[in-house]
């Protein structure tokens, strides 16, 4: 057998081995696997694999050439995650062609008859390098960017652009808009002067996933199937706000910054682009990559795991959103959902903001409920000051497309607040239904500055976001999904008020890790009634304080509010979400975010 014939056989075997190994890695990455298996896959296997793969070439090439081949293969593999991040958008567009090219190369190398392979030079060593290049390009596409083709109707010329901006974990009372001191938010204050400020906006839950599912579906968590972070998925049967807007011809983009907001929990529904890649730097994406993608650079995996994050900093997420926005047709209306997580613990503000906040630690109001939490609350304020600086930059980009915001609806809110000693809860929110977590900011800019400077005292909730957006596109309320009464917030300026005197609000804290401490509650104009899964009851005059449990002093009032709560809950349509198994990665990510048992 000639040397050329031998090279054909050896290269085919090498390519076949490469393909088989990659498919094993794909299969392993698609199921829940132990960390031991992952380490074996990404560290132990590559050495014999590359030795077996390159040995035939070493036998047929000079030492100088083999070093080049080895260097190319290893360098390409090590830098693959970085390249995948940098060129994510471009690679997404060509992913199908790349996949076809990979298959074609493998088929050519492995199944071309010998005489044709030898005649046309398929056995040449240079073919091996592009084969590796194409094959590994299949692993470039970040798996966490969801792109969906959404059928749509023709949009109306006067359809407004819609921006939903969520500042995670921002309680209302620390903002100057709501009476707080010691925190400068000049961009928010200027924005509020041309917007409508809602003084009594209330979150239904203190948990990131459920409250955002509520914003995007217009349904309470019991009715949309997502009542806790990570453990369940909002079913596809739930029609979401981006799905409705897509049906009206809107471009829809979602950009989120924390693990509970991953698309796999149902949040990507209706978005043409949903970017939920976690981490600021390319290497941080290791936690999101499959073993197939990191099997060579996996040498660093044990060291990187400790430093990886389950969230992404605000500037990175906002930059992704702005990049998407600038790619959209200026004639087409858009819906952009932007979720920023910076105010969530752990509090790590930029030094310039931290310095100012710490200087005001004793004068800022409200003070931390527990004095020992004062320094943490100061850093929390510094994080919010950072968010305000990001907001100023975002508004500039939005106004480039719509000068004066003549045709743009912008909703700025938060999913919940944070406790600094309230109820014995520190730097957390999950077990709380206190005002520290449930009273949240809500500021809405309506097109052409309608209602600018108004302040609305009536109680509103995140359930009103969906009808507000759809009402802006011309829909009437009867066509919208509702499990309880909701209101388009345009009523605030069109009728100089919301049109109701008092609105009771259903509350719940149902994260599964709370066990028997899971809560349901009802908030009236003056009182708040809470009952735990174990049956423990509390009644607060929350306008005055939430320290004294008035259950024994006002038992009849407690009975009446409890009856209202139970009647309301029993009338709700209940939808069970898809139950998800909790992986080791889920547990690590939630631990990184402070969600521990």
Label the predicted regions:
Residues 2-597:
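Catalytic domains that recognize anionic headgroups
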């Amino acid at each position: 057998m000639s040397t050329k014939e031998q090279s054909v056989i050896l290269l085919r075997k090498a390519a076949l081995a490469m393909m088989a190994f990659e498919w094993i890695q794909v299969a392993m990455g698609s199921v829940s696997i132990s960390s031991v298996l992952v380490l074996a896959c990404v560290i132990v296997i590559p050495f014999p694999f590359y030795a077996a793969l390159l040995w035939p070439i070493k036998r047929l090439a000079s030492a100088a050439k083999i070093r080049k081949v080895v260097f190319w293969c290893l360098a390409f593999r090590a830098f693959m995650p970085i390249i995948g991040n940098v060129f994510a958008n471009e690679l997404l567009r060509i992913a199908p062609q790349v996949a076809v090219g990979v298959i074609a190369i493998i088929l050519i190398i492995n199944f071309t008859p010998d005489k044709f392979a030898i005649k046309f030079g398929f056995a040449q060593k240079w073919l091996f390098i592009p084969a590796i290049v194409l094959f590994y390009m299949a692993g470039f596409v970040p798996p966490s960017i969801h792109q969906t083709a959404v059928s749509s109707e023709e949009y109306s010329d006067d359809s407004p652009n819609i921006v939903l901006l969520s500042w995670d974990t921002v309680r209302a009372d620390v903002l100057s808009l709501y009476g707080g001191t010691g925190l400068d938010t000049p961009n928010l204050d200027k924005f509020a002067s041309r917007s409508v400020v809602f003084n009594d906006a209330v979150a239904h839950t203190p948990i990131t996933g459920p409250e955002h599912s509520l914003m995007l579906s217009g349904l309470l968590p019991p009715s949309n199937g997502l009542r806790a972070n990570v453990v369940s998925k909002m079913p596809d049967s739930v029609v979401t706000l981006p799905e409705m807007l897509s049906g009206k011809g809107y471009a829809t983009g979602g950009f989120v910054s924390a693990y509970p907001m991953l698309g796999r929990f149902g949040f990507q529904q209706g978005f043409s682009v949903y970017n939920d890649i976690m981490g600021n730097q390319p290497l941080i994406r290791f936690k999101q990559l499959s073993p197939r993608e990191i099997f060579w650079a996996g040498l660093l995996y044990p060291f990187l795991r400790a430093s990886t994050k389950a969230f992404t900093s605000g500037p990175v997420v906002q930059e992704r959103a702005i990049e998407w926005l600038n790619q959209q047709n200026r004639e087409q209306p858009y819906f952009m959902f932007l979720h920023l997580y910076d105010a969530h613990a752990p509090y790590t503000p930029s030094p310039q903001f931290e310095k100012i906040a710490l200087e005001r630690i004793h004068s800022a109001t409200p003070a931390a409920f527990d004095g020992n939490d004062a320094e943490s609350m100061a850093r929390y304020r510094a994080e919010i000051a950072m968010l305000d600086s990001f907001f100023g930059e975002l508004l500039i980009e939005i106004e480039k497309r719509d000068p004066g915001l003549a045709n743009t609806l912008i909703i700025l809110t938060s999913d919940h607040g944070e406790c600094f000693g309230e109820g014995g809860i520190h730097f957390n929110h999950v077990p709380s239904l206190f005002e520290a977590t449930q009273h949240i900011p809500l500021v809405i800019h309506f097109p052409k500055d309608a209602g600018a400077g108004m302040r609305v005292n009536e109680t509103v909730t995140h359930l009103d976001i969906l009808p507000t957006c759809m009402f802006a596109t011309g829909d009437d309320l009867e066509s919208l999904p509702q499990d309880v009464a909701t209101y388009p917030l345009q009523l605030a300026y069109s009728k100089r008020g919301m049109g109701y005197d008092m609105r009771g609000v259903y509350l719940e804290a149902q994260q599964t890790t709370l066990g028997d401490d899971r809560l349901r509650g009802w908030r009236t104009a003056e009182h708040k009634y809470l009952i735990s899964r174990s049956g423990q009851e509390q009644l607060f005059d929350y306008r005055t304080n939430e320290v004294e449990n008035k259950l024994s002093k006002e038992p009849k009032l407690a009975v009446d509010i409890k009856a209202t709560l139970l009647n309301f809950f029993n009338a709700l349509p209940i939808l069970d979400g898809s139950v998800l198994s909790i992986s080791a990665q889920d547990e690590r990510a939630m631990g990184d975010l402070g969600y521990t048992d």
